[in-house]
Amino acid sequence: MPSAKKRDSPSVDRRDRLTLAKLASYDDIATDALVDRAYFWTNTRKNRTKYNPMRGIVDDDVARVLLHDVIVAKDLAKAERELLAMSGLKKFMARLPNNREKDWFRRHLRKYIQMYLPDSPFEITTTNRYTITEYEAAVCARKFIKQGQEIKYLSGTLVPMTREEERDLDLKRKDFSIVMSSRKKTPSFFLGPARFANHDCNANGKLVTRGSEGMQVVATRDIYIGEEITVSYGDDYFGIDNCECLCLTCERLVRNGWAPHVPSEPQSKASTPALNDDTLSTDSHVSSKKRKFAPDSDIETSAPSTPCKRGKFVRQSSKLKSEVSFLEVATSIEQPAGPSPVCNGSDMGALGNSTVESDNDKAVDPALPSPPADSPPSTAANESERSSTSTTATSVCDAAVKIKVEETIEQSAEKVSALSEANVELPTTSLRSGSTEGDTKLELSDQPSTLKQGSIGSNRKERRKSRGKPLVVESVEAERQLVRVPGDYTKTSKLLAQTYDRWVDCHTCNAWFVQHDSYLTRRECPRCERHSMLYGYRWPKTDKEGPSDDEERVMDHRTVHRFLYPEEEALISRKDRGVSFGVTPTPELSEPRTETEGSEGCEDRRTTRASRRRTRSLRMTM
């Protein structure tokens, strides 16, 4: 009878299965060695956040193996042995615990080696359509692909995911290639060369499973040379109905993420109920998860109706000058010198109520002493604004009154807890008109203050510090969204960081690219230049096209002149460094003019007036 220890231990297949962590590490090593180190102009996104590039792998060595063993000799086994003999990959293979994991890594590495064969119809490139300032990997076709044809070597490896791995991915908030199996109804992790295929609402390819661990891309329509190979990620992958999608199809149709941003109309205060703290916190949490360029969201329509926004509006539009008569104020001030009268209970209650109401609207500490010159109008003036009649008791109160106010605002409860318990004597009362021109200040100082000068100064500093932090405004005003315009990622000044950076037109594929430190203009874009360095031909040619093809393959890329000749350089205009707003890279979109409507109208008027003057002069001479 078997022992309990053997019975409780998992099976060998379950213990040694290909997991998500293992496949992610294999893919990071393979992309680092065969994509980033193969004359690639940028680094691809890795699955592990703390991945460090391997040492012992040189770009020239990788390109030499790919050219001689893969492209010319078409010997994948020899190329695999040469690559695994490099010090970086050799050390990684030595760290693998058993032969089964070594076989998994070799099998996954072979998928990246195969995509450099001459009959491969695609290659890896980059695009900045989604983020403008950052380039992401994409798949571009370099051969014509018929509809229904399986795209050769554009494949990947599938790994089923567990509940723990799903939760781990949610916590890390990383964008992984996760596909849903239609038969098993379980999510699977998908990595390989096909993971670089981006989403498109009208995709020209689809993902098809091959066996238990394989995935292949099949063309759903004809794909032409230079066209990006895309697949569909799902209906609600980028929001509800893909409302945040930035694919090429949505760009051409100017919809979803490319739709013009229409600001919502401000709603009336009476029809919109006030939002409580729970609703406001929930909306702010939801908006933080949204992308910045999301179109019409709920947080935008509800933000202008919060009570904090109304409080700020009342404080800015105080009309003290129109409510308070300066004559009445002057007669009330001109009184014989003597002990100042004390406000009665009703007046004190009115003053306290007005103070509490204004504090709820403005979030200002009521227990602090008189505000400085840059403070807003007094709370008594706000009370006089609400009531049509202004009395002496509510607008001007004596300074020797001890007022004790209990703080009810949650935001400033911690700062004012020590001050709200003590009785503070107001030293002065200043009345200031709401107009900005010729402000009149009326001060009443009857009794000296009982507080020390140091405490008053510290209280004023605390008040200024609390007023200097616009906490309420941050919770009300939503973050400004990035409105995308079709073609805003091409020939834009956002990518020209240095003085000599400029946009250059490729002489091979006629695509615009950014050349850094363009003292001499390059002839080709990074994709076409990398292709010629690896294959020895101009893009998209990879091999001899027949027996009559006499073009020789360049085996040493250093013998090719990569810049324009002086006579060609003289024809290049360096004005504005190639920046042109509104120019789109797709021929389907009409190129809008760079002038505004007003300037076009002015040009028409200038032409019309000039033609009239010329006609009048001709009539006079005839």
Curated annotation (Swiss-Prot):
Listed EC numbers: 2.1.1.372
Biased composition (Low complexity): 376-394
Enzyme category, top tier: transferase
Stretches for region Disordered: 262-314, 335-394, 427-470, 576-622
Top-level division of the source organism's lineage: Eukaryota
GO biological-process terms attached to the record: methylation
Places the protein is found: Nucleus; Chromosome
Keyword terms, alphabetized: Chromatin regulator, Chromosome, Methyltransferase, Nucleus, S-adenosyl-L-methionine, Transferase
Biased composition, class Polar residues, residue ranges: 265-285, 427-437, 446-458
Domain SET: 120-234
Record field: compositional bias (Basic residues): 608-622
GO MF term set: histone H4K20 methyltransferase activity; histone H4K20 trimethyltransferase activity
Bias type Basic and acidic residues, positions: 590-607
A GO term from the CC aspect: nucleus
Classification via InterPro entries: Hist-Lys_N-MTase_N, Set9_fungi, SET_dom, SET_dom_sf, Suv4-20/Set9
Gene3D superfamilies xrefs: Histone-lysine N-methyltransferase, SET domain
Pfam family, one: SET
Catalytic reaction annotation: L-lysyl(20)-[histone H4] + 3 S-adenosyl-L-methionine = N(6),N(6),N(6)-trimethyl-L-lysyl(20)-[histone H4] + 3 S-adenosyl-L-homocysteine + 3 H(+)
Protein function: Histone methyltransferase that trimethylates 'Lys-20' of histone H4 to form H4K20me3.
Family: Belongs to the class V-like SAM-binding methyltransferase superfamily. Histone-lysine methyltransferase family. Suvar4-20 subfamily.
UniProt cross-references to PANTHER family, sorted A to Z: HISTONE-LYSINE N-METHYLTRANSFERASE KMT5B (PTHR12977:SF4), SUPPRESSOR OF VARIEGATION 4-20-RELATED (PTHR12977)
The protein's name in its UniProt record: Histone-lysine N-methyltransferase set9
